[in-house]
């Protein structure tokens, strides 16, 4: 990749990816990811099990419970929402990362396969994510989970969902989370900050239309309004749990992640901001063995261990 930007040498081989341009291409990609993930998860058995939970509209949401060896109960838990521009199923590396969080932070991971746009626009997927948190609380005894040590987390679109869930948990149900793990989160659907234009040509999503992604997620033009929790930077962030916010230097979402971190700080929230020097969006998924990814994973796990206590 030729670029005047000082992208980390270990990330310069990352190629540009194009989101599927129509429903048939999207369906084909989803089927491929499902098949690859099914094969990939086999190596994790019996540490990963599948179940379903009921969302607010009675939809059955698949979730994966990752329980590391010798985990003591009651254990802390991370409820995790994967990225994928609100339209894509998780990548195999999402499960690899989730397994590392479970093993190295000594926690249960509840990995949520929420509903995706465009078939299911907001708030379907968001409600699925919130239902997973409520389910973890309601089934804590069976799961062996300590309800006082719950963290929500996610990357990219999943970071948006985690931030929105954290807001809703406190504002509507006074659920006191232990933390928020927000990895290059998409927290501002207006998408007008300088990094969007500055890094639009940087892989992996070279030339991606952030407005199109946002409107696909919403199911209508941005001009028609943005519902509560869909764009977390517009929400009330006071009294929220401590947050880890990760913003790669050359990510088009960099500025909104930093702005969200500052909003949290301004409201008195404990924030650990990790601006990944030389990083690009999704670097940990696309270059998992790079030193950049290893350093970021270490920071995330250290944050989890700290807030779990």
Question: Which positions does each model-derived feature cover?
Answer:
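Catalytic histidine-centered segment of alpha/beta-hydrolase-like enzymes
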Residues: 279-292
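A glycine/proline-hinged amphipathic helix-loop "lid/cap" segment
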Residues: 1-68, 309
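Short amphipathic alpha-helix adjacent to the substrate-entry channel of hydrolases
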Residues: 92-111
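Short strand-loop-helix active-site module centered on a catalytic nucleophile
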Residues: 63, 79, 101, 122-189, ...
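Short beta-strand element of the alpha/beta-hydrolase
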Residues: 74-83
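Catalytic active-site module of serine/aspartate enzymes centered on a nucleophile-bearing elbow/loop
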Residues: 290-309
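Serine-hydrolase catalytic core
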Residues: 222-277
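Hydrolase active-site cap/lid region
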Residues: 167-225, 239
């Amino acid at each position: 990749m030729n670029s005047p930007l000082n992208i980390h040498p270990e990330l310069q081989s990352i190629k540009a990816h194009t989101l599927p341009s129509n429903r048939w291409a999207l369906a084909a990609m989803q089927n491929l990811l499902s098949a690859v993930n099914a094969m990939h998860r086999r190596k994790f058995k019996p540490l990963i099990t599948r179940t379903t939970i009921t969302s607010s509209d009675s939809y059955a949401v698949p979730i994966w419970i990752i329980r590391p060896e010798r985990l003591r109960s009651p254990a802390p838990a991370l409820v995790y929402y994967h990225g994928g521009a609100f339209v894509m199923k998780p990548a195999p590396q999402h499960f690899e990362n989730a397994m590392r969080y479970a093993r190295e932070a000594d926690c249960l991971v509840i990995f949520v396969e929420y509903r995706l746009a465009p078939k299911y626009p907001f708030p379907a997927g968001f409600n699925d994510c919130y239902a997973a948190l409520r389910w973890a609380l309601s089934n804590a005894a069976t799961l062996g989970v300590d309800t006082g040590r719950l963290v929500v987390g996610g990357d990219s679109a999943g970071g948006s969902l985690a931030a929105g869930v954290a807001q809703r948990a406190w504002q509507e149900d006074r659920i006191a989370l232990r933390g928020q793990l927000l990895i290059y989160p998409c927290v501002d659907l207006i998408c007008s900050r300088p990094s969007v234009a500055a890094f639009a040509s940087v892989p992996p999503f070279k030339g991606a239309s952030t407005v199109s992604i946002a409107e696909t997620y919403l199911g209508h033009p941005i001009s028609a309004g943005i519902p509560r929790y869909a764009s977390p930077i517009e929400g009330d962030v006071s009294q929220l749990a401590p947050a880890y916010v990760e913003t790669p230097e050359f990510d088009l979402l960099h500025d909104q992640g930093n702005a969200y971190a500052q909003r949290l700080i301004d409201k008195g929230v404990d924030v650990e901001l990790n601006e990944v020097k030389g990083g690009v969006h999704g670097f940990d998924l696309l270059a998992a063995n790079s030193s950049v990814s290893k350093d970021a994973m270490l920071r995330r796990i250290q944050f989890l261990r700290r807030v779990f206590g």
